[in-house]
Amino acid sequence: GESLTMEGGIKANRNPGNRPALDSVHFFTRTMHTYKKIIRYGTDPTGYYWEEVSAGGTHFYYGTLDGSSLDTTAVLRDGSGNVLRWYLRRIQDKWGNYVTYNYAAHNNTSTGNIKSGGKELVLDNIRYTGYGSTPGNYEIVFETSGNRQDARVMMNLGEKILDDRQLNSVKVNYYDNGTPEEVKRFDFHYINGDFDVHPLLEKVVEYRSGEYFYKHSFEYHHSTLSFHGASTLEVSDRNQMLFEDIPNSMSGHRAALFDEYKPSGINTTTTRGGS
């Protein structure tokens, strides 16, 4: 969300005009809190992707897996193919260890409602402890469902983007010889809130290796909606002096405002001296 400036002092959202497109362009934050390098790759809005390098040598890839090409699974596009939003695809430290973020795309195919034709990209799983060609032995999986009760529709990017998924469970897997084994899982159970608008988290149930381990329940205060009779608001008559305390407060300043001071008895003359 912070404003970026292109090398040469050019704002990133300004029309480049006849300036030649470059395959990689460096950007800088307007306020430098710490050093980091921000690089945009690609030559037009349909193929842009980003890389950020911190002072410690950690690489953050947005819309690309490794900084070599656009990854279409990690971007949200409009109908013309222009990229509207880039998602974090990988974090890699200076030693080559990395975490990979995978996403799932959902398109709303319903008809006759405000969500019709909307799209969204949500986090599907995170694979970590990766190195080299090995993606890592640990994985966090996010299971979601659609048609959330308090779904949101956003159109500030020029396209209908939804926030319609409800998180149902978070699962941790360990890959043993390429096969995922469940280590633990957290299931989320919801109830309807007041006015049936917002779902409320009722309980979180934890499982270890597929077996029930523990649960935590939540309780909420539900107040009764009621109405009272009309209240009468009385105001002073408009002819009554509204600032009746002003004369009293001004009386202490009367001497300074109304007393007449006579000129000084000392007269002044002009002299040239010695005459």
State where each predicted segment sits.
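Conserved catalytic cores of ATP-dependent inositol ring kinases
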Residues: 1-275
